């Protein structure tokens, strides 16, 4: 199929080839990214991209859905097996749309919701004023403790009692510690609120049994299907059976039309991979690598938000290096290490500048990097940031990155 693309559209082919080269030659540390299997890519590039299938298995608005019904049922059944969910909807095109569907299911415009502050580790869809969630609903923020940088559950309870939200949102996009979902449910029950958990970043760790599972505690669980779950880009919703019909209606016909059946097929393949024994080994290696990388960074004198990590994610506070997150992201990319600038708790810089850098170990672990490689990456990051204006040092860092990536070939069959 790549041969067809090359003949048909040289410009698009060239851009894709260049991206493949980038992924092969750089160290991918963006916490929300991963490398899917070739089987997942084959499913996503299959003839299922041709099929419209509005509705759900057994109740479609189009004919000819007998085979895509099988695929969607496989995906749903595998998610139920992985997470122990009563009901699953695998049609959301993204995590943001999964969150939107839950909001539309139980909230009215202007309802009060308690969500995590974006700079403290939350997500745009958890009430940011520039996002639909912050526009449509009255979000009240909770955050982390100023000293420990961990969620202060007593503060969450106090704010829940004060504001009496209809919904509490737990989960994060930049929080490196375990979240106590049981405690969140207790708080929700105390104030009569629903609980939604967004486990997008940690879903793969939950699937492997290496992070507490929110499903037994939450009324609704949303997630992306990529990140640590190592599937295609997309979303899904897990919920109690009592909300099944409402959730399904919120997705279709509520906020989406036809599902992307080729993506759902790729999701199904990834879920099948997550059920294999070696996926637990992979997830454990993600955590081991993150801990080793965090230790290495601290030995190099770098400051980590909350002092370390319990999952795949590390947040570096770069202020003591007298640079910004924006500068750190740029200079690391220049030497071949891909990260993203990120706000930190109690941030004073703008979101376009930031005081932090967010990194994660899911992608490099998929590539086969282990503890020794984490030591080298920690050294490389510190060396690059401390010498960000020294071109000779940056050239040396580039050579070290090249030496490291050359040992771990990527997608040799592509």
Curated annotation (Swiss-Prot):
Instruction: Please tell me which top-level EC class this enzyme sits in.
Output: transferase
Per its record, the protein catalyses: (6R)-5,10-methylene-5,6,7,8-tetrahydrofolate + glycine + H2O = (6S)-5,6,7,8-tetrahydrofolate + L-serine
| Recorded superkingdom | Bacteria
Q: Which GO terms describe its cellular component?
A: cytoplasm; cytosol
Q: Which Gene3D superfamilies match?
A: Aspartate Aminotransferase, domain 1, Type I PLP-dependent aspartate aminotransferase-like (Major domain)
Locate the N6-(pyridoxal phosphate)lysine modifications and list their residues: 227
Give the Gene Ontology MF terms in alphabetical order.
glycine hydroxymethyltransferase activity; pyridoxal phosphate binding
Name the InterPro entries for this protein. Answer: PyrdxlP-dep_Trfase, PyrdxlP-dep_Trfase_major, PyrdxlP-dep_Trfase_small, Ser_HO-MeTrfase, Ser_HO-MeTrfase-like, Ser_HO-MeTrfase_PLP_BS, SHMT-like_dom
* GO terms for biological process, alphabetical: glycine biosynthetic process from serine; tetrahydrofolate interconversion; tetrahydrofolate metabolic process
Pathway where it operates = One-carbon metabolism; tetrahydrofolate interconversion; Amino-acid biosynthesis; glycine biosynthesis; glycine from L-serine: step 1/1
- Name the cofactor(s) required for activity, per the record: pyridoxal 5'-phosphate
| Spans through the membrane | none
Task: Report the subcellular localization.
Answer: Cytoplasm
- List the keywords (alphabetical): Amino-acid biosynthesis, Cytoplasm, One-carbon metabolism, Pyridoxal phosphate, Transferase
Spell out the residues of the site Plays an important role in substrate specificity. Answer: 226
Q: Where does (6S)-5,6,7,8-tetrahydrofolate bind?
A: 118, 122-124, 240, 350-352
- Pfam families this protein is in? SHMT
Known partners and oligomeric status: Homodimer.
NCBIfam families per UniProt: PRK00011.1
Family assignment from sequence similarity? Belongs to the SHMT family.
Q: What is this protein called?
A: Serine hydroxymethyltransferase
What is the organism of origin for this protein? Answer: Bacillus cereus (strain ATCC 14579 / DSM 31 / CCUG 7414 / JCM 2152 / NBRC 15305 / NCIMB 9373 / NCTC 2599 / NRRL B-3711)
The organism's taxonomy opens as:
Bacteria, Bacillati, Bacillota, Bacilli, Bacillales
Name of the encoding gene: glyA
